[in-house]
């Protein structure tokens, strides 16, 4: 934190730990470490986003960075020309849609698959990939009265950041407009996850594309 560039790598983060998670899961490190002063949290999945992040870090003067990566091979969703900007969310779909999924890491693929399924049903949503928390975009979506679903494959660092930022800015938010899904229980209590495949764990936590569709359709 004293002008030193230190990047911490978390490999197989979130529920990507999968069947190796009998002893531990990388789901609570992010909400614990984000309490460190000046730490920048970045949670990525797309390989091109990863390259863009590494180029950003290599420029120097970034301080403490927690870079969280997936284990599985991931599909590219961004162009090679992507320029990473810390604190920026990337919107996929209609920005005027009344419902928005906010996610990060491998959750972006579940979000995009849910978006596709809902589009086939005649409903358009937006999906926001937030590898790092975008305070301005979150505030904008809230003030526009959007229905927001935080879908996080960890203990919920984006929603925690959201609560802090809305309080800091004095922006009122309605619990009726905000829904959260994470590795916490539905009562938002932290828990230990058992070992399982990614698919099994995503289903357990209600974070699969199918679960996101059902949550948006029946609960929002």
Model-predicted segments: where are they?
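Conserved thiamine diphosphate
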Residues: 1-100
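Thiamine diphosphate
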Residues: 17, 65, 70-220
């Amino acid at each position: 934190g004293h002008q030193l560039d230190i990047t911490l790598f978390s490999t197989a983060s979130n529920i990507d730990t999968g069947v190796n998670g009998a002893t531990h899961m990388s789901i609570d490190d992010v909400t614990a470490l984000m309490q460190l002063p000046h730490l920048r949290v970045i949670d990525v999945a797309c390989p091109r986003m990863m390259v863009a992040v590494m180029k950003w870090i290599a420029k120097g003067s970034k301080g403490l960075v927690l870079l969280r990566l997936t284990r599985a091979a991931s599909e590219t969703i961004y162009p090679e020309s992507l320029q990473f900007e810390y604190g920026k969310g990337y919107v996929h779909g209609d920005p005027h849609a009344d419902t928005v999924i906010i996610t990060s890491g491998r959750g972006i693929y579940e979000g995009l698959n849910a978006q596709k399924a809902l589009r086939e049903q005649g409903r358009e949503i937006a999906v926001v990939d937030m590898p790092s928390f975008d305070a301005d975009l979150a505030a904008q979506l809230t003030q526009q009265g959007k229905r927001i679903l935080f879908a996080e494959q960890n203990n919920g660092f984006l929603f925690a950041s959201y609560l802090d930022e809305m309080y800091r800015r004095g922006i009122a938010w309605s619990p009726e407009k905000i829904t959260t899904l994470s590795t916490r229980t539905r009562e938002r209590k932290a828990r230990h996850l058992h070992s399982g495949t990614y698919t099994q764990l995503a289903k357990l936590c209600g974070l699969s594309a199918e679960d996101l569709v059902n949550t948006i359709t029946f609960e929002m």
